[in-house]
């Protein structure tokens, strides 16, 4: 089917019984930073918080009445499932929804809420492709009509109405429209419409690095099935793209860019700062891709449109997003630093951090000769981490830059510590101090040099006050003097030396 055939299907698509024309909203802060006008096509504001409602309803509106009466079935990573459930409830038909077991609970609950008693939810497999295989078996057993999440002309046309709205809402020059890609339905529909109406506008697909089936397929010239897919951007975790979507993307798409998890987290934060809305990872793909493209191509004063495709975010994922956004936006650098285990070296190292805001500081005495510190600091530009590491090295502190090391960011930062045979006469304290620039360095400066620091843990949580865990080696003979030191210190504290968890894991 050529683009002009899809043009007719898109123009006559039945989506507005359930969906509405979403805003094309300027992202003012992001535009200023990228030096390019950026507009967000706010599909995250649809009734199911995702664009998927368009294609699902359009497909179901074209199913013959007798087949529709028997019921429909679909497989989905979550958002299409909500679209089918919502449409089924509106049409008064039964629907079976198969979702992967990895689907966020917020999406599973929403499917049931939108569909009501007429919807049956089955969880099967770890990815969309696994759920799809199971759905085909159920379809054959029950004689249901399958509503494909992306590889169907009516679904593609329904998603293509987004492009129709964008070009009507912004009739001036547009350099590129960025769309997320899982199976390719949205990208295929948008590209087919744009190339039929405004062929000078680029359409760029965006995928997660660990779920880039379309990028690999276009590079190979044929559909490539991935052995595994990453699940952070669960809404686009597709192992094999559709036949029709691949054909259309191969013909009309101008390219695909891939982004990592940190870039996705940074994009979620960017959209929040401009709109006060929280996108899901897949919903932020287009924004992350637009940022990467603008930086890579070195463009300025070019209008960029990003489709914010969904906002079905699990609340408990937000902490991870907040932490990783700093690295993705080149605002945090992470290092492992080795310092000599001698009096004054800890404080000397801290002085090198200077006026930079410390985001994390983990240390545990482990060796009589040297100590290893895990430290995070805020940075202002890409590449600054290399300068900081070089400065540490020039002052005799062996340094490893871990800013882009996945193991360190995901696990090691939480595992620094443990029992130490060298932590003799250790007493453990939680200190509280106001969270402001320079406050950590001021606290460290107030630590008396008479007692060795054997443990130190700090993480900036974004609160107005922070808690620091400090272990100090205080011989029995020094207890009276140490108590006077604590009283004069001026920071609220709680001694945790008798804490059961400390006794089990650290003492």
From Swiss-Prot:
Question: Is the keyword Amino-acid biosynthesis assigned to this protein?
Answer: yes
What reaction(s) does this enzyme catalyze? L-threonine = 2-oxobutanoate + NH4(+)
Query: Where are residues bearing N6-(pyridoxal phosphate)lysine located in the sequence?
Result: 52
Q: Which InterPro entries match?
A: ACT-like_dom_sf, Ser/Thr_Dehydratase, Ser/Thr_deHydtase_PyrdxlP-BS, TD_ACT-like, TD_ACT-like_sf, Thr_deHydtase_biosynth, TrpB-like_PALP, TrpB-like_PALP_sf
Return the EC number.
4.3.1.19
What does the annotation say about its assembly with partners?
Homotetramer.
Q: What is this protein called?
A: L-threonine dehydratase biosynthetic IlvA
What is the protein's species of origin?
Burkholderia multivorans (strain ATCC 17616 / 249)
């Amino acid at each position: 089917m050529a683009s002009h055939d899809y043009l007719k299907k898109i123009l006559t698509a039945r989506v507005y019984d359930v969906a509405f024309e979403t805003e094309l909203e300027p992202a003012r802060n992001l535009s200023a930073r990228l030096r390019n006008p950026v507009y967000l096509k706010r599909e995250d504001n649809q009734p199911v918080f995702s664009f998927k409602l368009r294609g699902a309803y359009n497909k179901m509106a074209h199913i013959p009445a007798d087949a529709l009466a028997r019921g429909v079935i679909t497989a989905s990573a979550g958002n299409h499932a909500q679209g089918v459930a919502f449409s089924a409830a509106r049409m008064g038909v039964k629907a079976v929804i198969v979702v992967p077991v990895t689907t966020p609970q917020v999406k599973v609950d929403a499917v049931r809420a939108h569909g009501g008693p007429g919807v049956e939810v089955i969880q099967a497999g770890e990815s969309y492709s696994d759920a799809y295989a199971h759905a085909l078996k159920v379809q054959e057993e029950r004689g249901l009509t399958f509503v494909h999440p992306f590889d169907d002309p009516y679904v593609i046309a329904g998603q293509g109405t987004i492009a129709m709205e964008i070009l009507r809402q912004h009739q001036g020059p547009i350099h590129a429209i960025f769309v997320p890609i899982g199976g390719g339905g949205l990208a295929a529909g948008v590209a087919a419409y744009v190339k039929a109406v405004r062929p000078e506008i680029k359409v760029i697909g965006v995928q997660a690095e660990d779920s880039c089936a379309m990028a690999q397929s276009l590079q190979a010239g044929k559909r490539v099935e991935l052995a595994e897919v990453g699940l952070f951007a669960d809404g686009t975790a597709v192992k094999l793209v559709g036949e029709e979507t691949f054909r259309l993307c191969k013909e009309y798409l101008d390219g695909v860019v891939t982004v990592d998890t940190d870039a996705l987290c940074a994009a979620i934060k960017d959209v929040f700062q401009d709109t006060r809305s929280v996108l899901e990872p897949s919903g932020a793909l287009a924004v992350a891709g637009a940022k990467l493209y603008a930086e890579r191509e070195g463009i300025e004063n070019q209008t960029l449109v990003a489709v914010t495709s969904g906002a079905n975010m699990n609340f408990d994922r937000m902490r991870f997003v907040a932490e990783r956004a700093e690295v993705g936006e080149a605002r945090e650098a992470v290092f492992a630093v080795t310092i000599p285990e001698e009096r004054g070296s800890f404080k000397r190292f801290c002085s090198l951090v200077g006026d930079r805001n410390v985001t994390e500081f983990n240390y545990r005495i482990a060796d009589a000769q040297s100590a290893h510190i895990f430290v995070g600091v805020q940075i202002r530009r890409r590449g600054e981490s290399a300068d900081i590491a070089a400065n540490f090295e020039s002052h005799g502190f062996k340094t490893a830059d871990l800013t882009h090391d996945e193991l360190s960011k995901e696990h090691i930062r939480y595992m620094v510590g443990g029992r130490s045979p060298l932590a003799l006469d250790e007493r453990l304290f939680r200190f509280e101090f106001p969270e402001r620039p320079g406050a950590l360095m001021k606290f460290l400066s107030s630590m008396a040099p008479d007692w060795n620091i054997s443990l130190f843990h700090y993480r900036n949580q974004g609160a107005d006050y922070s808690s620091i865990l400090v272990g100090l080696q205080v011989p029995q003979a020094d207890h009276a003097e140490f108590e006077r030191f604590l009283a004069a210190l001026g920071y609220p504290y709680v001694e945790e030396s008798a804490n059961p968890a400390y006794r089990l894991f650290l003492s």
